[in-house]
Amino acid sequence: MVQCLVVDDDPRILNYIASHLQTEHIDAFTQPSGEAALKLLEKQRVDIAVVDIMMDGMDGFQLCNTLKNDYDIPVIMLTARDALSDKERAFISGTDDYVTKPFEVKELIFRIRAVLRRYNINSNSEMTIGNLTLNQSYLELQVSNKTMTLPNKEFQLLFMLAARPKQIFTREQIIEKIWGYDYEGDERTVDVHIKRLRQRLKKLNATLTIETVRGQGYKVENHV
């Protein structure tokens, strides 16, 4: 079941969204502030976050930035502020979508599912290659009795490569699949994610490795 974090300082909004999410078989974890949301994430995995902008303490822009950079969680901003400058700031903060109040909760649910589809590459939740098992539902890697949870983007990148062993993916193909057509950042972010994945695979003693194909891109090899 999808786990959705909802952050708003209005308890009526929290209850309204949570009740409708439950009817759509989406688990809702409601929090009244950015600080409380981050505390929850220390012990609870979520798949997506719906975040209000106007909150005391940590506002929605700050929370969105933290969720994207530290947890790699897709974010939808929900707010009464509909000025173009606010929308621009929201997308600069990293939000994946933006919904203004008042809103139709069914539209919010449609948008939640649409964002999740962009983040999910393969409907198969589990895959094994060599001694490594990848569980997409929990973003986990497992080798024997060792288990490791990855940030969403790292996991989806590895899952995509592992699903097609020996196939070479260019940086452009990876960005298009993992970050989307509208990504405007540096393509070298792919190299950073690959470096982290190599470190994680080495730590797990996985037989899977990510190889660099000079001048072309990256591919996965399984050394059994």
Swiss-Prot record:
Record Pfam families: Response_reg (PF00072), Trans_reg_C (PF00486)
Q: Tell me, in a sentence or two, what this protein's role is.
A: Member of the two-component regulatory system HssS/HssR involved in intracellular heme homeostasis and tempering of staphylococcal virulence. Phosphorylated HssR binds to a direct repeat sequence within hrtAB promoter and activates the expression of hrtAB, an efflux pump, in response to extracellular heme, hemin, hemoglobin or blood.
A single GO CC term, please?
A: cytosol
Q: Does the keyword Transcription apply?
A: yes
Query: SUPFAM superfamilies given for it?
Result: CheY-like
Organism placement in taxonomy: Bacteria, Bacillati, Bacillota, Bacilli, Bacillales
- What is the first-listed, main subcellular location in coarse terms? cytoplasm
Encoding gene per record:
hssR
What keywords sit in the KW lines?
Activator, Cytoplasm, DNA-binding, Phosphoprotein, Transcription, Transcription regulation, Two-component regulatory system, Virulence
- List GO molecular-function terms, semicolon-separated: phosphorelay response regulator activity; transcription cis-regulatory region binding
Task: Kindly provide the PTM information from the record.
Answer: Phosphorylated by HssS.
CDD domains recorded for this chain? REC_OmpR, trans_reg_C
Q: Where is the Response regulatory domain?
A: 3-116
Positions carrying 4-aspartylphosphate are: D52
UniProt keyword annotation of Phosphoprotein present: yes
> Any idea which residues the entry calls the DNA-binding region?
124-222
Name by which UniProt lists this protein: Heme response regulator HssR
